UniProtKB/Swiss-Prot annotation:
Keyword DNA damage set for record: no
Span(s) of short sequence motif Selectivity filter part_3: 353-357
Periplasmic side: 68-74, 231-250, 308-327, 375-384
An MF annotation (GO) of this entry: antiporter activity
Family according to the record: Belongs to the chloride channel (TC 2.A.49) family. ClcA subfamily.
Name by which UniProt lists this protein: H(+)/Cl(-) exchange transporter ClcA
GO CC list: plasma membrane
Length: 468
């Protein structure tokens, strides 16, 4: 027996038997599962990529209307208000009338489905999330398309399971997870982050087998290839490429992580508080719900005219920040302002996510921190943009409690691979401080709220298939 074989046997002997059985006994992945995972990834990539293009089309059309026809016979501010109010109305109406589970991010719904506690009515969720998201995001509200893309990807996975009449529960679970991974990979052009998001963030629900891991990888890669074929291979965020920072500055990155850890706990609390306040206000009454949502959308139409930095998901704002167009004071004001607008939009139950708004908040505070650090420590060679990138990963890690996903996500989105060390330090610092303060992951909190929601329990649980 060779030394290598002896080492492998000794290593296996030290591992728990249930782990060995779970992984190695299912080493022979059926070809059908691999094929279905590939199909799920392709469809999730198509849905995610065209959803992004549809949102951009709505936003550009809204701007064109304001510049031409409508703006010629209505005051500009009134036209902006009415258009955005109508777009938001579409999103809120579709959600409240046809698929209440499509409200908000949608990621907690997929996690609940992976745990067997929530149904996936893909025949409702896919059209409602797609067209409702077009309306809500196109109105200028502070919402991200990434959470909806994950939910639609998961819905695609369940759709494929139903169409091909997959009965095996492990396979259905794997395809659901594969769809979620494909959705995130297509949303951010980040296949590694899509894979790791399912494995790390959804770890309480994800069933770790070689089959499920392979399904997730295949789907994420396929979805990302589809994205790149349609949109090209450029990174989602165009920004400067930085070299590795000096070792003497790493302590500042740890401090930034600690600050984001504290803020992440507060931010998660404010999100759930905002949702509770909105529910108490409209009490699930459709007229109140639609009127409130339309008014919010209209107000963001006005903000688009006068303070556009406080509107939209925030991905397009990130390059503007890192190009150095704002001072620290303005950045902190925008940071506070976007906290309020994020809570207002996400808390209202609109069909949109919180990924992109969180990344924008991390960039705002991180760049402001970098500017202040550069002023206080002129002897250090500080690039504020490095702290902006680290801030993106840190806030994601503190709120979602998935530091590895946050690190990979930011690196893939910005192509700043040299910043891996400061990203690790900042993200881990944020997670540690958030845990010390007793904070809980945001999606776990949102899933808990969903399971307590009587309206969702009554309207969403039946039926389980489109024909029942």
């Amino acid at each position: 027996m060779s030394t290598r074989e002896t080492f492998k046997i000794s290593l296996l002997a030290k591992m728990p038997k249930d782990v060995i059985n779970q992984f190695l006994s299912k080493d022979k992945t059926p070809f059908s599962v691999l094929f279905l995972s590939l199909l799920v990834g392709i469809l999730a990539g198509l849905v995610g990529t065209y959803f992004e293009q549809a949102v951009h089309l709505v936003s550009e059309t809204r701007t064109d209307w304001l510049k031409s026809e409508i703006g010629s016979f209505l005051p500009l501010w009134l036209a902006a208000f009415l258009i955005s109010a109508f777009l938001a109305f579409i999103g809120y109406f579709l959600v409240h009338r046809f698929a209440p589970e499509a409200a908000g991010s949608g990621i907690p719904e997929i996690e609940g489905a992976m745990d067997g506690m929530r149904p996936v009515r893909w025949w409702r969720v896919l059209p409602v999330k797609f067209f409702g998201g077009m309306g809500a995001l196109g109105s200028g509200m502070v919402l991200g398309r990434e959470g909806p893309t994950v939910q639609m990807g998961g819905a695609v996975g369940r759709m494929i399971s139903d169409i091909f009449r997959v009965k095996n529960e492990d396979t259905r679970h794997s395809l659901l997870a594969a769809g979620a991974a494909g959705g995130l990979a297509a949303a951010f052009n980040a296949p590694l982050a899509g894979i790791m998001f399912v494995i790390e963030e959804m770890r309480p629900q994800f069933r770790y087998t070689l089959i499920s891991v392979r399904a997730v990888i295949i789907s994420a890669v396929a979805a990302n290839i589809v994205f790149r074929v349609i949109n090209g291979q450029d990174a989602v965020i165009t920004m400067p490429q930085y070299d590795a920072p000096e070792l003497s500055t790493l302590g500042l990155f740890l401090l930034l992580g600690a600050l984001f850890g504290v803020f992440g706990v507060l931010f998660n609390y404010l999100i759930t508080l905002a949702q509770d306040l909105f529910v108490k206000f409209h009490r699930n009454d459709r007229k109140r719900y639609l009127l409130t949502g339309s008014m919010i959308g209209g107000c963001f139409g006005l903000l688009l005219l006068y303070v556009p930095e406080l509107t939209g998901g925030g991905i397009s704002l990130i390059p503007t920040i890192t190009n150095g167009g704002y001072g620290a004071g303005i950045l902190l004001l925008l940071f506070v302002g976007r906290i309020f607008t994020t809570l207002l939009c996400f808390g209202s139950g609109a069909p949109g996510g919180i990924f992109a708004p969180m990344l924008a908040l991390g960039t705002l505070f991180g760049y402001a921190f970098g500017l202040i650090a550069k002023m206080w420590f002129p002897e250090l060679n500080i690039e504020p943009g490095m702290f902006a990138i680290a801030g993106m990963g840190a806030l994601f890690a503190a709120t979602v409690r998935a530091p590895i996903t946050g690190i990979l996500l930011v690196i893939e989105m910005t192509n700043n691979y040299h910043l891996i060390l400061p990203l690790i330090i900042t993200s881990l610092g944020a997670v540690i401080f958030a845990q010390l303060l007793g904070g809980q992951p945001i999606y776990s909190q949102l899933l808990h709220r969903t399971l307590k929601n009587q309206k969702l329990q009554q309207q969403d649980l039946p039926p389980q298939s489109p024909n029942s």
